[in-house]
Amino acid sequence: MENKGVVYIDYLNSYVEVTKRKLPKWLSWCVYKLCNYFGFIKKNDNFFTLIAEENDVINEKMLNNLYEKLFEFDIKTVVCAELLLKNERFVKWIREKKIEILDGRWLFRFLPYDIFNKIAYIKNVKKSDLEVSILVNKPTELTNQNVVEFAKECKILNIITDDVLAFRVLEKKMLDEYGIIINVSTNKEKSCVRSDLIFNFDFNQKDLKKCKMNNKAVLVQLDKEKFIRNEGVTITFVKLKIPYKYGEIAKVYRHFNEEILYESFLYYKTSYKNVRKILKRDGVNIRYFIGNNGKIEFNEFRM
């Protein structure tokens, strides 16, 4: 089930897991400390376990051994246990080696249409009554597909960008094929003012601060960069309802975030439509939203 092109990096639950043999605890502890000191790593197919407990040191020898294994098998992408993702030194070291760490953002960018549907449901409003704005300077197939999805259903669709010319073909397609006009503008200050829902694909902090948003607007921060608003709801991630078959795997990969784990199973070079088909096939849907301060309660969207 797991993606063989990705390596999963975990840590030991307890020092007694250092060996499959049943040893006295004192001996297991000695073996563990020795293996930890020399930076040993247990490998089971594409699942690597660092010989380190939850709060133990991941030393230079272990990091070097890990890199050698990743280099040997030409691994460019890894999924890390949640605790390792919180280890700034470990994450920095991985990224310095030009290795990608899956963090859920790839999957998150395929979910704007689901977010749009969920928020309309929570607010108890028609999708055709919502004004949506998309903030993007470097359009991709993914952003363009989202534009098409929104334009067909929302009341007004605004695209705020520094590169208006990049959307000329899409503008013409929407008008010719669907009779839909989309508003493409460079005006960051005024274009978002009446928006109910704003999706930020790649605006940085400086550009975001130029965008005037009303307090009832929901900002969906698809970009990794954290953005703090004085008022209004900001969505930074989602909690998904994962299919049972994947949930059973998550019980085995118990140290891993479920959404990132699910992302890793889908992480291939494929089209927007293919990913959407898989999500529909698996019956994936949004349980709740996550903001800068954790879970966002549904009543916050109605304020």
Predicted features, each with a name:
Residues 2, 8-21, 31-92, 295-303:
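Metallocofactor- and cofactor-centric catalytic cores in central/energy metabolism, strongly enriched
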Residues 8-13, 52-55, 80-83, 135-138, ...:
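Structural motif
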Residues 18-25, 88-97, 147-149, 168-177:
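Short, aromatic/basic amphipathic alpha-helical patches
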Residues 84-91, 143, 164-171, 206-208, ...:
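Short, charged/polar "capping" segments at the starts of alpha-helices
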Residues 100-117:
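A glycine-rich, Thr/Ser-enriched phosphate-binding loop motif common to dinucleotide/cofactor-binding enzymes
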Residues 224-303:
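Adenosine-phosphate binding glycine-rich loop
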